[in-house]
Regions:
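Short, charge-rich amphipathic interface segments used for partner binding and complex assembly
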Residues: 1-2, 163
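Extracytoplasmic/periplasmic sensor domains and loops in membrane signaling proteins
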Residues: 77-80, 108-144
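Juxtamembrane segments flanking the first transmembrane helix
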Residues: 2-103, 108-115
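Short strand-connecting beta-turns/loops that link adjacent beta-strands
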Residues: 99, 141-143, 155-158
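Helix-start (N-cap) segments at beta->loop->alpha junctions
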Residues: 154-156, 163-168
Length: 168
C-alpha cells in the first residue's frame, strides 16, 4: 500500500510542478513581451523628439541664412555646412525640399539619394502644416525603414520650403 501512496504523491507532485512551471513560464513570457513593447515605444518617441529638435535647429540655420537674401534665396554653402554639422553629430540626414517635393539641399552633399526622388504631395502638405512625423521608406527614398520628421520653413505665415530630418 505504501508504494501506491508514494506513486500517487509523485504523480500529484508532478502535476502541480508542471502547472506551476507553466504558469511561471507564461508570466515571464508575457512580462518580457510587455517590456519589449514599452521599450520600443519609448525608443520611437525619443527618436522622434530628437529628430524634431534637430530639424528645428536646421530650420533656424536656414532662416538665418535666408534673411540676408530677403528670404528669396538659400545660401547653399552656409546652410549646407550647418546641416552637415548637425547631421554628423546626431547621425541624422537633413534635407531641404521645395513645395513641389524636389530636394534643394542635403546634409550628404550633391550626390545623395534624396535628389533622385521627389517627396509625394501629401507628405509635403502634412509637413508644410507642421504635422509630418512618420516611419517608412519616404516614398522609396530609403531602402529600409527610417524615422522621418518634416517641418515647414516659414517667413511670417508663408511656407517657403520644407525641411526633413531622418534616421534609421
Amino acid at each position: 500500500m505504501s508504494k501506491i501512496k508514494q506513486s500517487l504523491r509523485k504523480s500529484l507532485f508532478n502535476r502541480y510542478f508542471a502547472l506551476c512551471s507553466a504558469v511561471t513560464l507564461a508570466t515571464v513570457a508575457i512580462m518580457g513581451a510587455l517590456v519589449i513593447g514599452f521599450s520600443a515605444s519609448y525608443f520611437s518617441e525619443t527618436t522622434r523628439a530628437s529628430l524634431r529638435k534637430n530639424a528645428e535647429q536646421a530650420v533656424e540655420i536656414t532662416l538665418v541664412g535666408m534673411e540676408d537674401y530677403g528670404y528669396q534665396k538659400v545660401p547653399v554653402s552656409t546652410v549646407q555646412n550647418g546641416y552637415r554639422i548637425i547631421s554628423s553629430t546626431t547621425e541624422t540626414q537633413i534635407f531641404l525640399v521645395n513645395l513641389e517635393g524636389k530636394t534643394l539641399l542635403c546634409s550628404e552633399g550633391e550626390n545623395c539619394n534624396h535628389r533622385t526622388y521627389s517627396i509625394s504631395e501629401d507628405i509635403i502638405k502634412k509637413a508644410a502644416a507642421g504635422e509630418y512625423d512618420g516611419s517608412g521608406t519616404l516614398g522609396g527614398i530609403y531602402d529600409t525603414s527610417h524615422y522621418t520628421v518634416g517641418i515647414p520653413i516659414k517667413h511670417g505665415e508663408e511656407v517657403l520650403a520644407v525641411l526633413f530630418a531622418s534616421t534609421e
